């Protein structure tokens, strides 16, 4: 069960974690869309694995499925993975008039994670070109080390690891409250990602329930708390009940993002 409690959190650190895990979920959605369009050489995401080291504070996120294109960009001669992860405004998620089903941040997202990290590492396998790419970023993204590119016959995946700059966040290290928030956020992703994708946190599978069942974690079973639940659209699921806290509360997600402050959708 999910328990309501007061906790101390650092919004910037939480957002860095959120950016990484939403990227994993976004990748699963995009590849599914490509498969529906019958594009070739698409391997779907089947696993998302999140690891948070409680001692060192290092965070690692991995998803399988198509990796990043391991090739040099024709215009600026930079490796595409370095552009995506290490240079601002280099994604393709810019069209404001386009209906969005992903939670990307218009080219800023993971670069900001690295700016607030002592170091970060990326690794990806491009099964189409048969290449594995690894690269390290240090000192809050001021130092971009030379990538290692080699041949590979492995299945595709992308993995990112980073050590947040806890001092910049006014912290001595990873706290118990932040660790638990990261764990809870991983559970969220498990329920807003397609059921064909297995989600793990520190090696253990998280419950990949439907949204109605996920409500039980917050408010208890139907026999305990009466509620109404509807799916008016294939991209909308809504549940409501009397608040157990005797005041208005809400839990909501939009394109995988936890909208903890609500919004027009609420």
Regions from the PLM with identified roles:
Residues 2-6, 24-49, 91-102, 123, ...:
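Active-site phosphate-binding and catalytic loops of NTP-dependent enzymes
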Residues 1-17:
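Conserved short strand/loop->alpha-helix "switch" segment adjacent to the catalytic nucleotide/phosphoryl-transfer site
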Residues 197-266:
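GHKL/Bergerat-fold ATPase module in large chromosome/replication-associated machines
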């Amino acid at each position: 069960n999910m328990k309501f409690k007061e906790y101390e959190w650092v919004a910037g650190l939480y957002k860095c974690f959120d950016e990484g895990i939403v990227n994993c979920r976004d990748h699963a959605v995009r590849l599914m869309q490509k498969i529906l369009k019958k594009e070739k050489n698409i391997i779907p995401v089947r696993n998302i694995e999140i690891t948070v080291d409680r001692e060192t504070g290092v965070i690692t996120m991995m998803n399988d499925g198509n990796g990043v294109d391991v090739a040099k960009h024709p215009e600026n001669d930079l490796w595409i993975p370095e552009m995506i992860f290490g240079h601002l405004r280099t994604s393709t998620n810019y069209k404001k008039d386009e209906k969005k089903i992903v939670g990307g941040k218009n080219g800023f997202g993971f670069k900001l994670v690295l700016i607030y990290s002592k170091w970060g590492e990326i690794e990806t396998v491009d099964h189409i070109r048969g290449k594995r790419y690894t690269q390290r970023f240090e000192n809050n993204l001021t130092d971009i080390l030379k990538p290692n590119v080699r041949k590979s016959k492995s299945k595709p995946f992308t993995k990112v690891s980073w050590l947040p700059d806890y001092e910049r966040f006014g912290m001595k290290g990873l706290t118990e409250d932040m660790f638990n928030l990261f764990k809870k956020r991983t559970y969220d992703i498990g329920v807003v990602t397609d059921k064909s994708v297995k989600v793990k946190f520190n090696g253990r599978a998280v419950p990949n329930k439907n949204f109605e069942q996920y409500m039980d974690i917050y408010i208890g079973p139907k026999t305990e708390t009466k509620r109404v639940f509807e799916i008016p659209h294939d991209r909308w699921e809504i549940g409501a009940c009397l608040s157990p806290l005797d005041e208005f509360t809400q839990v909501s997600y939009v394109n995988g993002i936890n909208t903890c402050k609500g919004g027009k959708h609420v």
